């Protein structure tokens, strides 16, 4: 069965597919691979990365992540959330027009990283209430020490093993089946790609109504 055949309601609306996981788990790589696969299947698709570093909030976030400016944990959490809210209408319009949207990091990253720093879970979650709920979440997870050995690790302030371990625990507490699909990120890139395609092929959109977090 082709990917296009597995999306029976794509003529009605697109899907919202979110990739989550700790840093250096291969999210961006798999987002790009899925994006190209869907394009080859003649499925209209867009790809978005959060934080979106091109906006005003995104530029501040970029400076913060690189250690160039200081912001309180509460302030940076709100800034990350605002960064998502800025383009949610565009995402919604795309989906309603039959375009599938792939997102590299979403609300769950914002919650996990903030809770890992000691903020209250419910407080962190409330800033996300009202954003679109994904149809599929691909959660890539693996051994933190393996992630730390990958190129570029440590270039941003959260890329520390002790922080990533806490983030991983927060992610594990948020997992809801069948929305979340957990994949071992320590595997070969192409094996992971195939597993993701299988998840999407098996997905059944029960109705075309959008749901919200």
From Swiss-Prot:
<dbReference type="Pfam" id="PF02223">
    <property type="entry name" value="Thymidylate_kin"/>
</dbReference>
<keyword id="KW-0067">ATP-binding</keyword>
<dbReference type="GO" id="GO:0006233">
    <property type="term" value="P:dTDP biosynthetic process"/>
</dbReference>
<dbReference type="GO" id="GO:0006227">
    <property type="term" value="P:dUDP biosynthetic process"/>
</dbReference>
<protein>
    <recommendedName>
        <fullName>Putative thymidylate kinase 251L</fullName>
        <ecNumber>2.7.4.9</ecNumber>
    </recommendedName>
</protein>
<keyword id="KW-0545">Nucleotide biosynthesis</keyword>
<comment type="pathway">
    <text>Pyrimidine metabolism; dTTP biosynthesis.</text>
</comment>
<dbReference type="InterPro" id="IPR027417">
    <property type="entry name" value="P-loop_NTPase"/>
</dbReference>
<dbReference type="GO" id="GO:0004550">
    <property type="term" value="F:nucleoside diphosphate kinase activity"/>
</dbReference>
<feature type="binding site">
    <location>
        <begin position="21"/>
        <end position="28"/>
    </location>
    <ligand>
        <name>ATP</name>
    </ligand>
</feature>
<dbReference type="InterPro" id="IPR018095">
    <property type="entry name" value="Thymidylate_kin_CS"/>
</dbReference>
<dbReference type="InterPro" id="IPR039430">
    <property type="entry name" value="Thymidylate_kin-like_dom"/>
</dbReference>
<keyword id="KW-0418">Kinase</keyword>
<comment type="similarity">
    <text>Belongs to the thymidylate kinase family.</text>
</comment>
<keyword id="KW-0808">Transferase</keyword>
<dbReference type="GO" id="GO:0006235">
    <property type="term" value="P:dTTP biosynthetic process"/>
</dbReference>
<dbReference type="InterPro" id="IPR018094">
    <property type="entry name" value="Thymidylate_kinase"/>
</dbReference>
<comment type="function">
    <text>Catalyzes the conversion of dTMP to dTDP.</text>
</comment>
<dbReference type="GO" id="GO:0004798">
    <property type="term" value="F:dTMP kinase activity"/>
</dbReference>
<dbReference type="GO" id="GO:0005524">
    <property type="term" value="F:ATP binding"/>
</dbReference>
<keyword id="KW-0547">Nucleotide-binding</keyword>
């Amino acid at each position: 069965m082709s990917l296009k055949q597995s999306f029976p309601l794509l003529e009605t609306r697109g899907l919202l597919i979110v990739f989550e996981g700790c840093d250096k788990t291969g999210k961006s790589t798999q987002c790009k691979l899925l994006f190209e696969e869907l394009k080859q299947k003649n499925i209209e698709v867009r790809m978005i990365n959060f934080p979106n570093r091109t906006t005003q909030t995104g530029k501040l976030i970029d400076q913060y992540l690189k250690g160039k400016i200081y912001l309180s944990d509460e302030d940076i959490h709100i800034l990350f959330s605002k960064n998502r809210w800025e383009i949610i209408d565009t995402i919604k319009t795309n989906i309603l027009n039959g375009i599938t949207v792939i997102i590299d990091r979403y609300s769950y990253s914002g919650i996990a990283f903030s809770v890992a720093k000691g903020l209250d879970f419910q407080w962190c979650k409330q800033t996300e209430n009202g954003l679109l709920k994904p149809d599929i979440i691909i959660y890539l997870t693996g051994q933190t020490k393996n992630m730390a050995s990958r190129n570029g690790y440590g270039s941003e302030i959260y890329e520390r093993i002790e922080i990533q371990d806490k983030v991983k625990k927060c992610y594990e507490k948020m997992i809801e089946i069948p929305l979340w699909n957990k994949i071992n990120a320590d595997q070969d890139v192409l094996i992971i790609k195939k597993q993701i395609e299988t998840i999407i092929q098996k997905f059944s959109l029960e109705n075309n109504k959008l749901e919200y977090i």
